[in-house]
């Protein structure tokens, strides 16, 4: 059983116990507050595997999950923002993460310059937007929406 959960350090700065009609834990950040009641169902979390991108000096910033192959199994789509890649990973039969496809979304940043640019790619979603009943990968990069249709 995992007893420590990593919190996004940029979002939450403090964890405090509170009583709001029952025991709870609050997560406090500069512009956000969340609370978790300590009652109800108890979940046991178990680490299955871990993944480090093979992209040299890469930084995995965010992840979404979706079935991009039509197999009925979801893949993990990591947004790698240091070198601007999408990195697809899936679980094998032994519940181990296996690298799949990866590609660079763009070669260089826009005219705004890199100093104050947002991490790119910054948003992804998996949905059928082409109307062929197959999930597609939708990516927000700079001021563009890119659609990668499933073949």
Region roles according to the model:
Residues 1-151:
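Beta-propeller-forming repeat regions
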């Amino acid at each position: 059983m995992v007893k420590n959960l990593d919190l996004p350090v940029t979002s939450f700065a403090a964890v405090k116990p509170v009583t709001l009609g029952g025991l709870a834990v609050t997560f406090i950040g500069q512009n956000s507050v969340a609370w978790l009641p300590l009652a109800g169902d108890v979940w046991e979390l178990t680490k299955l595997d871990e993944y480090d991108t093979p992209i040299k000096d890469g930084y995995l910033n965010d992840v979404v999950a979706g079935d991009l192959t039509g197999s009925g199994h979801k893949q993990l789509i990591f947004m790698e923002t240091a070198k601007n890649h999408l990195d697809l990973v899936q679980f094998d039969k032994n519940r181990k993460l296996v690298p799949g496809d990866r590609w660079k979304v763009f070669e260089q940043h826009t005219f705004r310059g890199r100093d104050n640019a947002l991490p790119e790619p910054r948003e992804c979603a998996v949905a059928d937007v082409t109307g062929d009943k197959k999930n597609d990968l939708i990516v927000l990069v700079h001021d563009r929406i890119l659609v990668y249709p499933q073949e």
